[in-house]
């Protein structure tokens, strides 16, 4: 069986852990049942959850059995954040989000075979527990002093907002999840982000006190860029995995923009490429950075992992059509709309408005005289076809799927025309 810890360390996917040699021995001894939890606090998972899904997949490929926990109960409580109380959502909203997360998670794991994954929901055991049961059977094993010393709890208590008893109690519920999964599924390992370390160790302590058994946890580091800032924000916000919240095209473009200083490290973290493949791409970054081979490989791999091969091909076709000279008419309406969603746009009338009007309306030129000059010199195109007539009028044949047309000035100034 693969020494999975060495692989995770090489990829930069291992931060804190319980006793390393004991954990290594435990994993090498045979299939281990492990779990990672995902709370439905939003309609979609994001790139941070993707790191955890990738770790789960690595462990499964090494022969271990994943339990993917959707927090139908803990999602109604909310893990304490660095600042500010979470807004509690209704039971119906949390259930809807939990269903969506269930669907997203299921794409990353195999649910058949000797290391088959299992989906679980902590609402199944938490909703059956009364307040008295929780306090008598679980709460008595927790010491308030230890709970107060957890990093985020301590920061929140010291802040003006403080922390509610609801969020303060979250760590008890998470620890109980580990205990329940140990009892129900023989689960002996929890994985998660480094910000969850304190809660995860709480589960290890609880199982030791209640069952007299040693279990394990390991965390991934918080992903940062080479300059030390946190990784994972686009102009539109978080890097969502749901295509309804971030289109596959925008998702691909985000990864394509990763800096040279970060791309090799991110290839290790976010893809399943071999050491040899990544080392070859590292040479490309060092010797031919302008070709951006590593960024293209990263963007393609992560997009295919999250959205599938068909969506990747659509994204590549759209990218080629917009920036590589491909045929824009090959794009269907949905792909074209997604690829042009963030471009500037103007509404114009077929048969009345000219290409010069469009250049002015978009702010590409200050006036019609300059616009006509640009057109005459071959500096403007409609749908990747150069326009040279300075009096050219927008025509029916210029209309693409969805009533759109693309206009370009030079190489970099690209915009959308909404034609009617």
Regions found by a protein language model. Name each.
Residues 1-196, 201-204, 211-216, 229:
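NTP-dependent nucleotidyl-transfer catalytic core
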Residues 207-420:
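Conserved nucleotide- and phosphate/pyrophosphate-binding catalytic cores
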């Amino acid at each position: 069986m693969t020494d999975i810890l060495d692989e995770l360390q090489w990829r930069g996917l291992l931060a804190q852990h319980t006793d390393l040699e004991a954990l290594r021995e435990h994993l090498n001894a045979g299939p281990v049942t492990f779990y990672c939890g995902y709370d439905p606090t939003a309609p979609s998972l994001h790139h941070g959850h993707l790191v955890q899904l990738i770790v789960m997949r690595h462990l499964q490929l090494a022969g271990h059995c994943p339990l993917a926990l959707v927090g139908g109960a803990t999602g109604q409580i909310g893990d304490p954040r660095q600042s500010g109380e979470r807004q509690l959502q209704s039971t119906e909203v949390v259930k809807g989000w939990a269903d969506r997360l269930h669907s997203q998670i299921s794409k990353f794991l195999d649910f058949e075979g000797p290391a088959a994954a299992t989906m679980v929901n902590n609402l199944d055991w938490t909703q059956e527990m009364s307040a008295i049961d929780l306090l008598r059977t679980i709460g008595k094993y927790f010491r308030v002093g230890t709970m107060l010393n957890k990093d985020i709890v301590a920061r929140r208590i010291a802040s003006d907002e403080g922390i509610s008893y609801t969020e303060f109690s979250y760590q008890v519920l998470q620890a109980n999840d580990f205990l329940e999964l140990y009892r129900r599924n023989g689960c002996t390992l929890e994985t998660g982000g480094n910000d969850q370390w304190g809660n995860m160790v709480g589960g290890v302590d609880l199982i030791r006190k209640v069952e007299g058994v040693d279990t394990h946890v390991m965390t991934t580091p918080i992903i940062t860029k080479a300059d030390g800032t946190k990784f994972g924000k686009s102009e539109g916000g978080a890097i969502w995995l749901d295509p309804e919240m971030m289109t596959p095209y925008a998702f691909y473009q985000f990864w394509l923009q990763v800096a040279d200083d970060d791309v090799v490290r991110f290839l290790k973290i976010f893809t399943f490429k071999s050491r040899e493949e990544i080392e070859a791409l590292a040479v490309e970054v060092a010797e031919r950075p302008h070709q951006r081979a590593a960024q293209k490989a990263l963007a393609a791999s992560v997009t295919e992992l999250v959205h599938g091969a068909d969506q990747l091909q659509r994204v590549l076709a759209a990218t080629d059509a917009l920036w590589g000279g491909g045929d824009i008419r090959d794009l269907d309406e949905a792909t074209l709309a997604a690829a042009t969603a963030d471009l500037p746009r103007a509404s114009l009338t077929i048969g009345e408005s000219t290409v010069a009007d469009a250049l002015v309306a978009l702010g590409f030129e200050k006036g019609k005289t300059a616009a006509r000059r640009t057109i005459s010199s071959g500096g403007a195109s409609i749908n990747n076809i150069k326009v040279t007539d300075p009096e050219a009028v927008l025509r029916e044949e210029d209309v693409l799927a969805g009533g759109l047309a693309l206009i370009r000035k030079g190489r970099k100034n690209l915009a959308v025309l909404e034609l009617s």
